[in-house]
């Protein structure tokens, strides 16, 4: 049997009776249902090792139970719960009653529920039509009540097990959910009927945490859970609260859920069923026992999986020896012609390029051929024809094995409902080709703006050269920018021309190659240390593949910067549990990618800032969170101190040793500033501080063992600073040998710690900022932004370091 834990080293204490659980699913499936009743969920709980599921007895609709049957549940009180395949949230519709354990009281409550529940549920559905179960579509009034009533299977008698405490935070929700992008996801946090409210109101990851079950184990998930308010309450860490559950119990619960999820998972080829949702809400606690008080489970049959794409062929896409282009006009500057010009302008050999065009000998000195298969197999084929012609081109390329990789430029292939059918036809052809012995060609796009590959020596963006971002003139850096949106990449590089990645890759619609595929390739590319990814959505299970590759990239010493667009809350269905709302799609994506080791940006601005820092500081050592800060303006010093806390992480203002402080005082005395400037952190050197003082103070801080990074805020408006783009020899010229620019560049080369600059002051001083950025010293417009960006970057570096120290590899 496979190991269904996420890690080969996982210490799992849980024992799962998979045969018993599969039998429960089989019986339910044969009964025509795709969801378990509550008492069946408790049977699953017993099969995964739960110690204390409550005793239950189903009273089927239409039966006349005896007094003995009604009194079969121990205790002075008993809980009555309505049983229906369409009612999940029973409390909201009057489907839960607690009564004295007496036959007459039970019968009265039971009969009342059989009438009142349909009435209340019907009113709820009429108020929430969008969340109505499909079984009741189009029904209202009496017809709706009757349909609901017909679905009532009876009432479940449940053992009443009062918790030790009913105060806030003493209930726990634990849920498994099958997600389209990340597969099986485990979540846990504050439970009960107000679980969604807690998740909405509390800070991120305070009420609930989530993780992919293939990317974690019980111990790792428990370490995340320990950061929540839920754990604080359960562990008795709040005033007046006593511990009500042991760490081992929680760990065993998480272990069992991970094993359960990974067995009944779409990633398990042997899975007899797939769990779509499994939830216990809540677990209550009595005398150090975890008591499940309600549960749901939905499941489905396994679906056929798609043949993996031959990711190794991405090498031919990024490093082609031969390039073909379809769609080049001989008479005008269309997209194909612009792409041709950009390929040649980047220096790709003209004799290695072919234009696919009948009736034409050459265009711009490049030879034309009548079809894609005329002169053997191409490494890369750029298809710049309208979308309606793409299916025929794809057919020809596949049938004649004409190319190793294909770039689909045109849109109109899946973005709209009208183009959906055409897209599905193309996808089916490509997937079929991947079943061949060599895997067939790989396709990037459609709706792809192109690729700039410095190592491959080409540029296929359809942007005219005179409108192209000027970063093309800069020295390539060991980074890759992968963007689902070409426009996002283009606009970002226009705003940040000092960004200069080796690869700039527009993924488009992910008709074939995915974000996960590209990171899988780039994690092993020797030209890349930093991978920045802008994502709008993942293909089926590609989020999981993406995270696995992120983790492997991090373990290999690389950095991954990630931004996910689209945070709209998912629609809520009456037949879904709380888990889907608590751990929504964006929250799951952010959690999984962050836990894999990437730094996750919350805004586009953060993404660009973090990419700049990763590109320029990757080779620097980051050993801690102790910051040294220098400014020539008092307000900047204050703003830097105010910016060290970024919510999930805090930089510390480093203390200075007596040796360092003495060196600083000596510098101040030499500059006759000892009566004006105090040694502190942040250090305000006032506008009287010259270029030398700024840099020498920064050098002392960088040499100080108690400092891990330095932010140096320049004051270009100061009369003491050489900050203008004037001729050398001018007293304010940044080109002088004693200028702040010259000194900072030399200091950055000497130090192995991060040095980040800030330079306010408007466009007059843009040349100095640009010179620093171009030389690899990151510069921000404001000091507070510099500190906040550095804090997030340091957090990610320390997180990645902890992952590498753990040495855990994802299967």
Give short role names for the model-derived ranges.
Residues 1-811:
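Catalytic-core regions of core metabolic enzymes
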């Amino acid at each position: 049997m496979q190991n269904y834990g996420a890690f080969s080293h996982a210490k799992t204490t849980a024992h799962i009776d998979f045969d018993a659980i599969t039998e429960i699913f089989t019986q339910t499936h044969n009964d025509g249902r795709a969801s378990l009743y509550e008492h069946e969920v408790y049977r699953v709980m017993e099969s995964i090792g739960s110690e204390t599921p409550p005793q239950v007895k189903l009273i089927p609709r239409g039966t006349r139970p005896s007094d003995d049957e009604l009194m079969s549940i121990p205790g002075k009180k008993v809980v009555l719960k309505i049983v229906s395949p369409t009612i999940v949230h029973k409390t909201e519709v009057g489907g839960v009653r607690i009564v004295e354990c007496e036959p007459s009281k039970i019968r009265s409550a039971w009969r009342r529920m059989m009438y009142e529940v349909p009435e209340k549920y019907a009113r709820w559905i009429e108020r929430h039509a969008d969340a109505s179960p499909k079984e009741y579509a189009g029904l209202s009034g009496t017809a709706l009540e009757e349909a609901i009533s017909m679905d009532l299977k009876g009432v479940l008698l449940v053992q009443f097990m009062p918790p030790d405490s009913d105060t806030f935070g003493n209930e726990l929700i634990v849920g498994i959910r099958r997600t389209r992008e990340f597969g099986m996801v485990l979540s846990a946090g504050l439970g009960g009927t107000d679980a969604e409210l807690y998740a909405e109101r509390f800070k991120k990851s305070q009420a609930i945490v989530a993780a992919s079950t293939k990317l974690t184990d019980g111990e790792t998930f428990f370490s995340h859970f320990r950061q929540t308010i839920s754990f604080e309450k359960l562990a008795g860490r709040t005033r007046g609260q006593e511990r009500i559950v042991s760490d081992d119990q929680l760990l065993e619960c998480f272990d069992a859920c991970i094993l359960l999820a990974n067995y009944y998972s779409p990633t398990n080829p042997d899975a007899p069923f797939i769990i779509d949702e499994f939830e216990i809400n809540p677990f209550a606690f009595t005398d150090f026992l975890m008591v499940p008080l309600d549960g749901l489970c939905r499941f489905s049959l396994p679906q056929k999986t798609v043949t993996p794409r031959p990711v190794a062929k991405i090498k031919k896409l990024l490093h082609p020896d031969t390039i073909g282009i379809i769609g080049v006009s001989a008479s005008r500057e269309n997209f194909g012609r612009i792409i041709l010009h950009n390929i040649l302008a980047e220096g790709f050999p003209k004799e290695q390029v072919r234009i696919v065009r009948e009736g034409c000998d050459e265009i711009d000195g490049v030879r034309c051929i009548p079809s894609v298969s005329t002169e053997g197999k191409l490494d890369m084929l750029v298809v710049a024809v309208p979308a309606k012609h793409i299916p025929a081109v794809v057919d020809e390329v596949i049938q004649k094995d004409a190319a190793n990789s294909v770039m689909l430029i045109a849109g109109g292939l899946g973005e709209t409902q009208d183009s959906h059918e055409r897209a599905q036809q193309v996808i089916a052809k490509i997937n079929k080709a991947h079943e061949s012995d060599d895997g067939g060609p790989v396709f990037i796009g459609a709706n792809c703006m192109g690729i700039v590959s410095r190592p491959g020596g080409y540029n296929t963006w359809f942007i005219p050269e005179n409108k192209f971002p000027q970063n093309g003139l800069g020295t390539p850096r060991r980074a890759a920018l992968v963007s689902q949106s070409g426009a996002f990449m283009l606009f970002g590089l226009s705003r940040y021309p000092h960004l200069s990645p080796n690869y700039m890759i527009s993924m488009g619609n992910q008709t074939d190659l995915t974000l996960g595929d590209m990171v899988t390739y780039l994690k092993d590319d020797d030209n890349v240390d930093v991978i920045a990814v802008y994502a709008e959505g993942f293909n089926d299970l590609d989020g999981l593949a993406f995270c696995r590759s992120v983790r492997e990239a991090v373990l290999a010493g690389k950095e991954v910067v990630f931004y996910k667009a689209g945070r709209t809350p998912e629609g809520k269905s009456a037949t879904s549990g709380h888990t889907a709302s608590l751990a929504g799609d964006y929250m799951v994506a952010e959690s999984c990618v962050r836990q894999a080791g990437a730094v996750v940006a919350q805004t586009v601005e953060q993404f660009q800032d973090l990419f700049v820092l990763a590109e320029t500081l990757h080779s620097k050592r980051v050993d801690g969170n102790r910051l040294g800060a220098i400014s020539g303006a008092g307000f900047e010093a204050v703003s830097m101190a105010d910016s060290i806390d970024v919510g999930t992480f805090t930089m510390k203002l480093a203390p200075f040793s007596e040796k360092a402080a003495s060196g600083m005082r000596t510098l101040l005395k030499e500059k006759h500033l000892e009566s004006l400037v105090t040694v502190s952190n942040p250090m305000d050197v006032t506008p009287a501080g010259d270029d030398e003082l700024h840099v020498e103070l920064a050098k002392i801080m960088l040499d100080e063992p108690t400092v891990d990074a330095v932010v140096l805020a320049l004051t270009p408006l100061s009369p003491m600073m050489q900050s203008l783009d004037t001729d050398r020899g001018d007293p304010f010229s940044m080109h002088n040998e004693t200028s702040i620019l010259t000194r900072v560049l030399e200091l950055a080369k000497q130090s192995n710690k991060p040095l980040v600059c800030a330079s306010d002051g408007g466009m007059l001083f843009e040349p100095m900022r640009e010179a620093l950025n171009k030389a690899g010293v990151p510069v921000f417009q404001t000091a507070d932004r510099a500190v906040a960006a550095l804090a997030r970057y340091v957090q990610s570096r320390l997180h990645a370091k902890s992952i590498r120290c753990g040495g855990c590899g994802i299967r």
